[in-house]
Amino acid sequence: MARIAGVNIPTAKRVPIALTYIHGIGNHVAEQICDAVGIDRARRVNQLSDAEVLAIREYIDANVTVEGDLRRETSMNIKRLMDLGCYRGLRHRRGLPVRGQRTHTNARTRKGPAKAIAGKKK
């Protein structure tokens, strides 16, 4: 297995598909990487030479934010919003939907399981 950006990518798959196993690389970026390095998109990972794998690894290290760095950057952006006290930060803090979705009904994924209300008894 080829190891790129700390991830073992599958050897039997085509190169662009295998690169999407890395957090932060989707289909479009994977195809851009193949074009930039000069690797045919139809080739499989087990057909790549060590030099080609090294070229992919160097290109990703230089041009793409992936894995731990991307996760850290995302969490720091959310923390910054919470520290600012802006509306989006408050929604993150309270565990509610951030992007304007309704919360009267639905939003159970973000709010967690329904809580029982000690309400009126019949």
Swiss-Prot record:
Any GO molecular function: structural constituent of ribosome
Pfam family, one: Ribosomal_S13
Family: Belongs to the universal ribosomal protein uS13 family.
Keyword Membrane (UniProt): no
Protein name: Small ribosomal subunit protein uS13
GO CC annotations, alphabetized: cytosol; small ribosomal subunit
Keywords, in A-Z order: Ribonucleoprotein, Ribosomal protein, RNA-binding, rRNA-binding, tRNA-binding
InterPro entries recorded: Rbsml_uS13_C, Ribosomal_uS13, Ribosomal_uS13-like_H2TH, Ribosomal_uS13_bac-type, Ribosomal_uS13_CS
PROSITE patterns: RIBOSOMAL_S13_1 (PS00646), RIBOSOMAL_S13_2 (PS50159)
Annotated GO biological process: translation
Gene3D superfamilies tied to this protein: 1.10.8.50, 30s ribosomal protein s13, domain 2
Its biological purpose: Located at the top of the head of the 30S subunit, it contacts several helices of the 16S rRNA. In the 70S ribosome it contacts the 23S rRNA (bridge B1a) and protein L5 of the 50S subunit (bridge B1b), connecting the 2 subunits; these bridges are implicated in subunit movement. Contacts the tRNAs in the A and P-sites.
NCBIfam families linked: uS13_bact (TIGR03631)
Region of interest (Disordered), ranges: 99-122
Gene name for this UniProt entry: rpsM
Subunit and interaction comment: Part of the 30S ribosomal subunit. Forms a loose heterodimer with protein S19. Forms two bridges to the 50S subunit in the 70S ribosome.
